[in-house]
Amino acid sequence: MKKRKSKSWAMAYCGMAAALCVALMLLGTIIPIAMFIAPAVASFLIATVCMECGITMAWTAYAAVSLLGLLFVPDKEIALIFTVLLGYYPLIKPKFDRIRPRALQLVCKLLLCNAAVLAMYSLLLVVVPAGSVSQELRTTALAMTLLTLGMGNVAFALYDRALCNMLLLYKLKWQPKLHKMLGMH
């Protein structure tokens, strides 16, 4: 007989996942290479909340992690990457995955990524102005910005694929073990 998940179990799972997400983002502040890895792993945890507890609880966890991250994570860029793009992406990914053909699907995903990144850095530049920069540096900065944005698109496409694979692994391997351990099999 299959046991049903109680509301208290769902709330506890949601709270634990949210706390772990914030802890990961705090860890991303300490370990420089984890600056982009921490929000990506945190977004995977939000996706597991969606799978275990439903979309409403997942959006609640996303909102809690975003707010707590912006309040407590010292490196605001990590919290903003989660809040502006990676945190909610697993929740809207199924809608993007229905788009056909696949080339259009990828274009739509990259448009979301670019819009989110440009909005985030525009906000950062408004809050923390860069001051006056010589014309020579502006040209170099534009080229580097475009190069970085291109590399970010490649990284986002890889993240999208990795998220798909990790969720499949979770569903096939980790979720049954979690349910068995908790007596929910």
Question: What function would you assign to each model-found segment?
Answer:
Residues K2-C53, M57:
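Hydrophobic transmembrane alpha-helices
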Residues K2-K3, K7, L142-H185:
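Alpha-helical transmembrane segments and their cytosolic interface
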Residues M11-G15, I37, W59-A63, A79-L80, ...:
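Hydrophobic alpha-helical transmembrane segments
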Residues L26-M35, S66-K95:
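Interfacial aromatic-anchored transmembrane helix boundaries in multi-pass membrane proteins
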Residues A42, A61, V65-G69, L85-L86, ...:
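Transmembrane alpha-helical core residues of multi-pass small-molecule transporters
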Residues D75, L110-V127, N153, A157-L158:
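Mid-bilayer segments of alpha-helical transmembrane spans in multi-pass integral membrane proteins
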Residues T83-S122:
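Short helix-perturbing small/polar motifs within transmembrane alpha-helices
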Residues V127-A141:
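Membrane-interface helix termini and inter-helical loops of multi-pass transporters
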